[in-house]
From Swiss-Prot:
Residue positions binding DNA: R47, R70, E158, G231, D233
Binding, Mg(2+) 1: D34, D86, E158, E160
Ranges where the record places region Interaction with PCNA: 336-344
Organism phylogeny: Eukaryota, Metazoa, Chordata, Craniata, Vertebrata
Cofactor: Mg(2+)
Co-factor binding comment: Binds 2 magnesium ions per subunit. They probably participate in the reaction catalyzed by the enzyme. May bind an additional third magnesium ion after substrate binding.
Residues with N6-acetyllysine modification: K80, K354, K375, K377, K380
Gene Ontology cellular component list: chromosome, telomeric region; mitochondrion; nucleolus; nucleoplasm; nucleus; protein-containing complex
Subunit details: Interacts with PCNA. Three molecules of FEN1 bind to one PCNA trimer with each molecule binding to one PCNA monomer. PCNA stimulates the nuclease activity without altering cleavage specificity. The C-terminal domain binds EP300; can bind simultaneously to both PCNA and EP300. Interacts with DDX11; this interaction is direct and increases flap endonuclease activity of FEN1. Interacts with WDR4; regulating its endonuclease activity. Interacts with POLB.
Protein family: Belongs to the XPG/RAD2 endonuclease family. FEN1 subfamily.
Organism of this sequence: Macaca fascicularis
Protein name per Swiss-Prot or TrEMBL: Flap endonuclease 1
Length: 380
């Protein structure tokens, strides 16, 4: 779920924090991608006649086709992706996971009714609601990525929290996910729609946390409390407090504790055994991988092993897979050129980005840095 209504709220009250870019704008950028979110998108979108793709044994293959071709598209545009997979969900998420199970059970009933009535559109709608990323999906995608020469990481807990940690450490430029709580975990830059279907023609949305905080007049701890009031995966919110009211309350009272102290409990009853303090702590200090221990390497694809896996086991067209491998290899040759701003130490924020740093002599001959370009947030 992420944070309820956060994207719309930012668009309404801090529109300058959002920038829309074409995928070509990210040439030379390293990006940490929420793998489970991407796989879920592939299972929903990569279909034939409303059904997921399958091989002759009835095994789902939509996730593999999506991962293969979307990753190639990113590489062809000079993006260096690293996929981050979910680990064990935090205990605080158990309530949300239980609700999801209930919704799945209800969708199963509605699907059976739609099938009995022969309502094709309803069948497709409820079938998609039953989509769930499994361990097998994850394992197969990891195997595919290793054969493609694309790095992946296993997060100890929530993938988006580890993606945020990688951005904060300068290992990558941005975190790519549809879950807005990546900002709540402190990612300086969030990208949405990066792995969306090309046919949808959605521009990539880039959210800048520093500008969000600046426009709202909040610090990170206050922003976390705002997100908890909006509704997160880790605890309930106060019924009756909408996005606009939540912003006003946080701006005025600065913390959930002070808001609760001043609220009329008859109008805005606080949830029983409310775990907002625990959720607050989880967002500020999540369990994440150690960015300093991470070494990201992109290597040549293993064409024969890819053909063996994708064609021999999963029954994709050999001609298409070999063609994809050639595109991937060619893209690696083109992406070795670094971004210009990787050659300089650039500081500043969105508001100060117009100031130019003096160009050091011979700087164009220096080796490009591994990480993202300091605090400079332009996706050029």
């Amino acid at each position: 779920m992420g944070i309820q209504g956060l994207a719309k709220l930012i668009a309404d009250v801090a529109p300058s924090a959002i920038r829309e870019n074409d995928i070509k704008s990210y040439f030379g950028r390293k990006v940490a991608i929420d793998a489970s979110m991407s796989i879920y998108q592939f299972l929903i979108a990569v279909r034939q006649g409303g059904d997921v793709l399958q091989n002759e044994e009835g095994e789902t293959t939509s996730h593999l086709m999506g991962m293969f071709y979307r990753t190639i598209r990113m590489m062809e545009n000079g993006i260096k992706p690293v996929y981050v997979f979910d680990g064990k969900p935090p205990q605080l998420k158990s309530g949300e996971l239980a609700k999801r199970s209930e919704r799945r059970a209800e969708a199963e009933k509605q699907l059976q009714q739609a099938q009995a009535a022969g309502a094709e559109q309803e069948v497709e709608k409820f079938t998609k609601r039953l989509v769930k990323v499994t361990k097998q999906h994850n394992d197969e995608c990891k195997h595919l990525l290793s054969l493609m020469g694309i790095p992946y990481l296993d997060a100890p807990s929530e993938a988006e929290a580890s993606c945020a940690a990688l951005v904060k450490a300068g290992k990558v430029y941005a975190a790519a996910t549809e879950d807005m709580d990546c900002l709540t975990f402190g990612s300086p830059v969030l990208m949405r729609h990066l792995t969306a279907s090309e046919a949808k023609k959605l521009p990539i949305q880039e959210f800048h946390l520093s500008r969000i905080l600046q426009e709202l007049g909040l610090n990170q701890e206050q922003f976390v409390d705002l997100c908890i009031l909006l509704g997160s995966d880790y605890c309930e919110s106060i019924r009756g407090i909408g996005p606009k009211r939540a912003v006003d309350l946080i701006q005025k009272h600065k913390s959930i504790e002070e808001i609760v102290r001043r609220l009329d409990p008859s109008k805005y009853p606080v949830p029983e055994n409310w775990l907002h303090k625990e959720a607050h702590q989880l967002f500020l200090k999540p369990e994440v991988l150690d960015p300093e221990s991470v070494e990201l390497k992109w290597s040549e694809p293993n064409e024969e092993e890819l053909v063996k896996f994708m064609c021999g086991e999963k029954q994709f067209s050999e001609e298409r897979i070999r063609s994809g491998v050639k595109r991937l290899s060619k893209s690696r040759q083109g992406s070795t050129q670094g971004r210009l701003d990787d050659f300089f130490k650039v500081t500043g924020s969105l508001s100060s980005a117009k100031r130019k740093e003096p160009e050091p002599k011979g700087s164009t001959k220096k080796k490009a840095k591994t990480g993202a370009a300091g605090k400079f947030k332009r996706g050029k």
